[in-house]
């Protein structure tokens, strides 16, 4: 049981990092994402019609989704704002999000999380053909659930924290970046010069810098981040152009 629990923890962490990297949106979009609404897997099924794998996966977020998950609002002349009219569709390449592990996570790991959160009877398993629970189900039960977390969604900041820990590990242990704090916790302290560096928002800077600043593919950078070139150039890209 302990090994299974640990496997679920590690696979969840991998999925958080891989999906944030593949998607390019803000943390709130993925934190609020629900299966069947925003996460749309094309399933491979056996002769009985039961899901046995994922062929491909499409995500679909809209400007008129509920506030906790919708795309960033655009500002109108005069200071008003309205949701973007268009729908943003994207896909997760298997080179970033391993589809075999994704299937195990979506069906099996999320089933265990749903059981612990009280969202699914213990004798049932998530059926991906009809699944509408959160993409990232909090493994901790909550006594009171708002509409925003009715599907078991993680609390604010948790996804960014998981991504930040992975980014810190990569910078320190894989890339050997000198001068880093001794731990991720030290990097997050209020007086640390690295505070705010390790978090999910960094992937948007990386995307804008690589696709826009270095390769001058602002069209792709805009699609990846669902943001506009002036904003990406001013606040995200680290390459002056």
Per-range role (PLM):
Residues 16, 29-33, 221:
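Alpha-helix N-cap/helix-start motif at helix boundaries, enriched for small hydrophobics
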Residues 30-49, 53:
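Acidic, glycine-rich loop-and-beta core segments that form the ion-binding/anion-interacting portion
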Residues 1-28:
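Basic, Lys/Arg- and aromatic-enriched nucleic-acid-binding interface segment
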Residues 3, 117-120, 127, 160-230:
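Short, basic (Lys/Arg/His-rich) helix/loop patches that form interaction surfaces
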Residues 223, 232-241:
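DNA/chromatin major-groove-contacting recognition/catalytic segments
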Residues 11-13, 25-26, 88, 110, ...:
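Short, cationic motifs built from Arg/Lys/His that form the positively charged side of catalytic pockets
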Residues 50-152, 157:
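Basic, alpha-helical nucleic-acid-contacting "clamp/cap" segments
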Residues 24, 35-36, 76, 141, ...:
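An acidic- and aromatic-residue-enriched active-site/binding cleft used to recognize and process polar
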């Amino acid at each position: 049981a302990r090994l299974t629990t640990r496997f679920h923890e590690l696979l969840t962490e991998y999925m958080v990092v891989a999906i944030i990297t593949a998607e390019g949106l803000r943390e709130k979009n993925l934190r609020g994402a629900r299966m069947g609404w925003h996460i749309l897997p094309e399933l491979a099924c056996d002769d009985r019609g039961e899901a046995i794998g994922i062929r491909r996966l499409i995500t679909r977020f809209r400007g008129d989704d509920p506030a906790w998950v919708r795309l960033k609002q655009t500002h109108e002349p005069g200071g008003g704002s309205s949701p973007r009219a268009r729908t943003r569709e994207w896909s997760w390449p298997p080179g970033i999000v391993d589809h075999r592990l994704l299937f195990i996570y979506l069906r099996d790991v999320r089933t265990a999380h749903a059981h612990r959160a009280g969202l699914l009877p213990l004798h049932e398993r998530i059926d991906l053909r009809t699944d509408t629970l959160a993409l990232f189900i909090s493994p901790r039960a909550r006594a009171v659930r708002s509409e925003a977390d009715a599907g078991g969604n993680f609390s604010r900041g948790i996804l960014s924290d998981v991504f930040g820990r992975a980014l810190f590990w990569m910078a320190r242990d894989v890339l050997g970046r000198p001068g880093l704090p001794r731990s991720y916790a030290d990097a997050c302290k209020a007086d640390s010069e690295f505070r705010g560096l390790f978090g999910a928002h960094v992937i948007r800077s990386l995307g804008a810098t690589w696709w826009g600043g270095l390769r001058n593919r602002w069209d792709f950078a805009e699609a990846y981040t669902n943001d506009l070139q002036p904003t990406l150039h001013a606040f995200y890209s680290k390459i002056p152009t």
